């Protein structure tokens, strides 16, 4: 049973690490949602997307969550008419980041809920360990 609890703790901890990283990336996306380049022809900030992977921990016999990579979102930039901006093209349009605040808020909420679920799993595992130790006394 101790190995099962140890596996549960490791799985939940890896999930918490992954979701914590995801929250950092979402925060970075939100922080850069209005940033532009300072010159014509330069690209503005591109939304970052976190991809996860399952990794087998042979010692525990459990699949853990790890960050596979962080990729740039290849969707189109938004165009905003601002002919006085230094990065405006010859038609007066400025490319803005491809960050949608609503999508980022939803992504943040999902990561937060996943983080909380993993935290609850750790707390449940700790309670089970305490009860098991109590029974052995």
Task: Go through each PLM region and give its residues.
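Amphipathic alpha-helical polymerization modules
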Residues: 1-137
């Amino acid at each position: 049973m101790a190995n099962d609890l140890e596996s549960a703790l490791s799985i939940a901890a890896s999930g918490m690490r992954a979701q914590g990283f995801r929250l950092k990336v979402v925060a970075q996306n939100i922080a850069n949602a209005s940033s532009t380049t300072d010159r014509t022809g330069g690209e503005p900030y591109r939304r970052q997307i976190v991809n996860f992977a399952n990794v087998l921990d042979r010692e525990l016999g459990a699949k853990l969550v790890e960050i596979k990579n962080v990729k740039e979102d290849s969707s189109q930039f938004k165009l905003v008419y601002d002919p006085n901006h230094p990065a405006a093209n010859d038609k007066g349009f400025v490319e803005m980041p491809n960050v949608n605040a609503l999508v980022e808020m939803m992504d943040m909420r999902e990561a937060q809920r996943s983080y909380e679920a993993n935290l609850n799993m750790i707390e449940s595992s700790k309670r089970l360990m305490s009860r098991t130790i109590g029974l052995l006394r």
